[in-house]
Amino acid sequence: MVKILPPTASIDWDQISIATNLGLGHVESTYHMSTGRWSDPVFVNDPYLRVHGLAPGLQYAFRTPKGRVSIFRPDKHAKRMSHSTSTISIPNIPESLFLASVELAVTSNSSYVPPHTSRAMLYIRPFAFGSSEMIGLVPPSEYKFCVYVKPVPAYHGLSAQDALILTGFDRAAPHGLGHAKVGGNYAPVIKWSEQAKADGFGMTLHLDSKTRTEIDEFSTSGFLGIKVSDEGAVKVVAPSSPCIIDSTTSDCCLQLARHYGWNVEKRPIKYTELPEFSEVVAVGTAASVVSIRSITLEDSRETVRYLDATTNQGRYARKLSTSLDDIMHCRVEDVFGWCHQVGEAPVEDVPTRKMGSSNKKPAFVDIMTLSCAGQGARFSCH
C-alpha cells in the first residue's frame, strides 16, 4: 500500500494559479506493436518526456552531379510555415531564422544526403510547438522550433496507386484549418487510410465537407487532373478549395505545365468531372508525382479508371515527374530558381543540359485566387 502524504508546505495554496510550475513527476505507459499491449505504468520523477523528434505526435535535400547539396524551394516552405503558425497562435518564425536553421540541419547531416544517382532524398521536417507547462486554453509562454532530417525513399514509390474517396470522414471543416499544415489535419485520417489499404487502395481522396461534390485533395498529397483534347491540347486543372494545403509540388507542376505550353486552370473541380480527365496525379513533397490508376467512391463503389493494371505512370505524369526530378538533382538548367545550394562543392564540374520548353504561349486561368499556404513545412534537398 502506497503511503499518502499530507499537502506540501512548499506551496501557498491560497495563491496557486494554473501557470504555477511545480516540476511534478508523471506516469508513462508505452504501447509496442511487437507485443500488442501497453506496458505497466511507471512513475517518472521528472516533468519532461524523452521522445524522438520525428515522432508523429509532434508532427528533403538532394545531391547534385557535382557533389553539391541543394535544398528545394526553402523560401516557399518558409512562407507556408509562417502562414500555418499564424493560424494556431505560434509566434512568427522569421524567414531568415527558418532558412538558417534548415541550412544548419542539412550541412550538419550532409553525409546523409543520398548520392545523386539515387531516387532517395534527405527529408527535412521543420516543426514548431508550444513547449512550456500550460493546462488552460491560453497561449504558452515558450515555444520550440526544430528541424529534423532523415534520408527516405519516395513516399508512394514509383507505382500508380488506386485511390478511394472517403465518404464517412471529413478531412477539414469549411472554415477550419484544412489550409494549414497542422497535426490535427493528419492524425485523424490514419485510421481511414489503414482501412483503405486493407481494402486494396494505396491512397485516400477527400471531397469538400460542405457539399460533398467537389475535389479537395488526397490525404498525403495535392490533386491534379490532366485533360487532353482530340487535337492534342493539354490542360492541367488544380482545385482552388480554401480548405487545402498550398502544395509546393503542385505549384511546381503548374509552373512546369505553363513552361511546356499547356493550359493551366485553378478552380473548383466537381466530382462528376473525374471521368473527363485523361490522367490524375497526386503531388507532394514526399510523394513527388504519382499517377492514379483509378478512383473509387467509397459508398457506391463507382470507379473511374485512368491506367490499366500493367501501366505504372501516365505519359504526362512522367513528363512532369522527370522534369521535376531533373531540376531537383540539377541535371538540367534551373530556369525557375528553385534550388538553393548550400556548402562547398567537393568534386569536378559536370555540365547540365538545358530544359526543354514549348514555343506555344502558355495560358493560365486563375478562376479562383483564394489559395492557402501550409505550415510545419516538409521538403527536400537535392
Curated annotation (Swiss-Prot):
E.C. no: 2.6.1.-
Question: Per its UniProt record, what Pfam families does this chain match?
Answer: Aminotran_4
Q: Where is the signal peptide, in residue numbers?
A: none
Residues given in the record as pyridoxal 5'-phosphate binding sites: 80, 217
Keyword line:
Aminotransferase, Pyridoxal phosphate, Transferase, Virulence
Q: Molecular function (GO) terms listed?
A: branched-chain-amino-acid transaminase activity
InterPro entries to which the protein is assigned, alphabetical = Aminotrans_IV (IPR001544), Aminotransferase-like (IPR036038), B_amino_transII (IPR005786), BCAT-like_C (IPR043132), BCAT-like_N (IPR043131)
| GO biological-process terms attached to the record | branched-chain amino acid metabolic process
Specify the domain of life of the species encoding this protein.
Eukaryota
The text of the family note is: Belongs to the class-IV pyridoxal-phosphate-dependent aminotransferase family.
**Identification of the protein by name:** Aminotransferase FGSG_00049
Q: What species is given as this protein's source?
A: Gibberella zeae (strain ATCC MYA-4620 / CBS 123657 / FGSC 9075 / NRRL 31084 / PH-1) (Wheat head blight fungus)
